[in-house]
């Protein structure tokens, strides 16, 4: 009797087909129309360590402006579909829509190079572990000292049409079956958040939430002890399917360790006994094994600058090749090489003839200067059924902004019109206006820059435009033509002049 037995070999089924993400070059046609747009001089001045607040209502009198902050510029562009072009024959508004493509950018930075320092008047520093003078095994009640330092050196320029994504270590939630006692080490969790204007960069102490992970507020300098230091999540932004958050980025980081210290306080996790041989006398008790360094960014030089230079976008790292969806662009800038903190002094009394410290008040300020220049290329999209379906799956608000949909039927019904519209005998005739479109990014803080009225087709009138024409091999259109100069009329003379005879050589 023959029986059918199932095969024991493993059978692999093909995966379920998914929609493929394509490059914007597949459905975006570029034109030969270019525009220049630039900001005015952008300035920011404030206190480098903390905001100055009014004692009564905590109103910020002086904002916090530090060279260790992210500057996230949200660039608002005009709608090209409502743009006034001298010649509109290059596209069909019934079947096509226009978009901007960023092809050139230059981030200008003013102010001289300089190194800004920070510190803490009560930093948790126990001993100098690099050059220890004595074995400090028993710490006192309060060993905090006044320590200052410079930070890690960072230069960053990141461009996309969506806000940049950052990462940092925060306090996680323990499992419900784990008992948590006061003083236990909190669990860590990698958190992704949007990088906003004014967020602190990694200064050399790690990308972490110092507010929740350092309870004594004395582990790091003043400007970050109650802040979150974020680091751009390049891995997440590069792996984004549509590539909107990161067209390209420029990055330069450097750091070395200047001093080596250890922390005061009870050691939460003791050194295992098998890692050392117990001592006697002053070494009977182990010193604190919680070591930490003070970072330093070393020398700043103009030879290693990534700013004040033009950059041309030929091919983006993702599928979005520079298309500015939603008519907006995000430029994220970090430059710690111009982080000088200016010291200001104001005299309380000018009648004293002998110097006294109490006669003067000292202040700190930090100033920043930016200038953003762009070259945008006009592009058109033919709205076929496949393209519209793809764009709707990518971002449904794009088609809504284009006002692309079914037209309402003509109004053929009879309408009622009352004479006394304010009478209480009839229903209210006041129509409620439609609610304005809500900004999906209104809960975030950005440096808003409006370029809707700063587009110009005269590229040769701007420094970045002339650089673009030179590298692209294009010529600016002449404004006027020079004709041949006419000969000046001469008065006729009655006397005849003898013609010069030709002579053979």
Swiss-Prot record:
It is found in: Virion; Host nucleus. Signal peptide: none annotated. GO terms for biological process: endocytosis involved in viral entry into host cell; virion attachment to host cell. ISGylated by host HERC5, this results in dominant-negative effect on virus infectivity. Keywords: Capsid protein, Disulfide bond, Host nucleus, Host-virus interaction, Late protein, T=7 icosahedral capsid protein, Ubl conjugation, Viral attachment to host cell, Viral penetration into host cytoplasm, Virion, Virus endocytosis by host, Virus entry into host cell. One of its GO terms (cellular component) is T=7 icosahedral viral capsid. It comes from the Viruses. Residues 480-505 are annotated as: Disordered. InterPro entries: Capsid_L1_Papillomavir, Capsid_L1_sf_Papillomavir, dsDNA_vir_gr_I_capsid. One of its GO terms (molecular function) is structural molecule activity. Residues 488-497 have a biased composition (Low complexity). The keyword DNA-binding does not apply. Transmembrane segments: none annotated. Pfam families: Late_protein_L1. HAMAP family: PPV_L1. Belongs to the papillomaviridae L1 protein family. Forms an icosahedral capsid with a T=7 symmetry and a 50 nm diameter. The capsid is composed of 72 pentamers linked to each other by disulfide bonds and associated with L2 proteins. Binds to heparan sulfate proteoglycans on cell surface of basal layer keratinocytes to provide initial virion attachment. This binding mediates a conformational change in the virus capsid that facilitates efficient infection. The virion enters the host cell via endocytosis. During virus trafficking, L1 protein dissociates from the viral DNA and the genomic DNA is released to the host nucleus. HPV16, in comparison to HPV types 6 and 11, is more often associated with malignant genital cancers in humans. Self-assembles into homopentamers. The capsid has an icosahedral symmetry and consists of 72 capsomers, with each capsomer being a pentamer of L1. Interacts with the minor capsid protein L2; this interaction is necessary for viral genome encapsidation. Interacts with protein E2; this interaction enhances E2-dependent replication and transcription activation. Interacts with host KPNA2; this interaction mediates the nuclear localization of L1 capsomers. Interacts with host ITGA6. Interacts with host SDC1; this interaction promotes efficient infection of keratinocytes. This is Major capsid protein L1. The lineage of its organism: Viruses, Monodnaviria, Shotokuvirae, Cossaviricota, Papovaviricetes.
